[in-house]
């Protein structure tokens, strides 16, 4: 089936292009467009740190046993670089268009040579009060190589020309300045002029301040060019048997900071001699690694572009809705025992879930709390509630994944805090990331479980669309408890009747559910599959979906990211359609619905259809029996499939065409529905 499987990394590039498209849309508020540029750039940086680094390692490997993989990696790298070059041109044009439109709206970006006297005075004062001491140049003539200078930072390469009256040519020196953007932020608001808000890149602030930075070095003129380099994010894990898990991960994070440069982006107006010196100091000699760019790098900072108080240039805010039935004076744990409850963040407030943990921490009815944690907020209310529970005499067990990429240091910090408070901290199973989102609360009056699709992270809950189901159904709660037992004793065989749990049972059960739809289609029964998911790259699942399509099963997919499946191929996948939504919220929930001959089966949980989720992680999908939640899951998928404003057709070729039809924005309609339902429930409760 040639052309029926898309390489995951090419598919990812198509996904990220959908984000760039959102920045290009004229009907999107201008500051939101600026933010989408930042998101696009941030995604690309992480992609190069992780996926391109992995492909490069394979392509450069001397292992004779992976010749086929090596050739495939080289081919993929070439295709990605071609796509990236095309998308970069689009990106630069979008930056210019948005900057021009911003100026029409009264927000202007200034260069260092465009400042009036008041603004120059402001910049000089800023340098003396905040920047002085944070900008320490390194003379390239005095170093043989640029050492471990961190990752993903921006540098200014400075050409300094010192003039002497008795010489016709200046003495030329080159220096590097690491941008202090982590401390200062990337943008500086200047005093207004001509009724305009004025913004300046920190890069240009430093350009203006170069004579002050090099003061005492004699009369000179300066040129400065930005560049950045991205490093391989792979961690080298210590195999020392005497090291604990936490120590190994901490060493691994440290090794990442001195990883090999994967990509260097430089200002294309930089003199060749200066670029050559930088490449020499970085020990880079392959042209594939070097990418020319514009005046500014690290466009991910556009996510934090100053809004100057201009809410009119952003989408209206959707305030998270408090579900009235979860906000009564009644115990929330008792409310869950009456009926399955759920929240769908960010539409609903994450505080309802925090209330569950806080009540469990204080209630004398609660004996123990078990939780899986993958990523956590900086000031995590989840952790604070768990510490409170431990201090109130509950047995609290936390399974924390130390290898959550780029959150390793944060998770080490939280692990120590939890241990200091008397919480039992388990670091999971070697070789298996724990990605499931579970809570088990042991109570005298009846146990409770929470199963989610996303992280227990207050920050994520403001941006990522995720479900959290809270239940007291004994058959599900018992099995959630069994998952925690499996994590603590992973070599003990465990069977699950209700939950779909990887790495042992989830994949075969999903394949069986698809096969059941094929059988129903052949018997003339109702047969269809609706899926909302982040990624589909598992070859066995893709092949089974193709079989189902050929058997007459209609398959509708709402997908955010990687999609190796190609919908609409004659004789292969003509019964499969897929769309991807890019909007205010990041689509993150995983939902599966199978027609089951007219008696649909519903599932939600943490797993995508990728080998890593189905084989290399502990993931959990739960069946959903509550009719209200079933209706909500189906509505979410159906609205997404109908979306004509923010959904693109996923076709395996990266065309990302918009759907036809009357304007319909699924996220907006969901919020309107939830708001109406909340008001109606309030009326019922207050009668």
Residues covered by each model-derived region:
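Glycine/threonine-rich ATP-lid/beta-loop region of ATP-binding domains
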Residues: 539-546
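Hydrophobic alpha/beta core scaffold segments
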Residues: 554-558
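N-terminal localization/anchoring segments of enzymes in phospholipid and broader phosphate metabolism
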Residues: 1-529, 547, 551, 563-585, ...
